[in-house]
Amino acid sequence: MKMTGAQTQMLKGIITNPDHPEFQGIFKQGDFWIATDRMSIFYFKKKPNLPICQGCDQNLVDLLDTPLSAREIKLPSIDFMVGVQNKASCERKHILPYELDAKAKVFINSKFMVRMMKVLPDVTVAICTTPKKPIVFHGFGDDYGVIFPMIHSDNSLYINHEGELISPNLGEEIIKEEDECNSIETVTSM
C-alpha cells in the first residue's frame, strides 16, 4: 500500500510519545514494520517513510495469531465511527466505549478505531475472541492492525453497534432528546 501524506502524518502523531522513546519510529519484527503507541499497533509489509527506532523485545507479531474460535466482525463505515466520536463529545466524555461486538461483549475506544481506519483504509474486518484479548484488523492488503479493547463496566454509558447511546443502569424506557449536537437516545428511569 502506498501511504498518503495524511496517513504518514497520522502515524507520526502516533509514534510521538515522550514517555517511550523506544517507540518513536518504526521497527522490524518478522516480516513486518511496526508502529505503535502501546494501545494500537500497525503492521506494514513495506517500510513507511518514518524513522527507525529501537522497538521492543516482546513479539508483537504473535498478536496477529487468532484461534479458530475467533469471531469475525464486519466494521462500520468511518463516517459512522466519526459520529460515535461526536456522541462522546456531546456527552462531554473524552472516551465513550463503542460496543464492537455485543455477543462477545467487546468494547473499543472509538478514537483508536477511527485512527485505524484512516491509517489502514482498506481494513474491513475485525477479529476478536474475548473482551480482554487484542482485536485484530485486516482488509484486502498485507497490512494489519491491532487495538487493545476497553474494559467496560456493566453500569456505565456506552454506544452500541447501532450507534445508540446506552445507559444500562437507569431503567428501560428510551427517550429521544434533541440537543445542539444531534439526536441522541438515552435511557431514563421509569
Placement of each model-derived feature along the sequence:
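DNA polymerase processivity clamps
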Residues: M1-M190
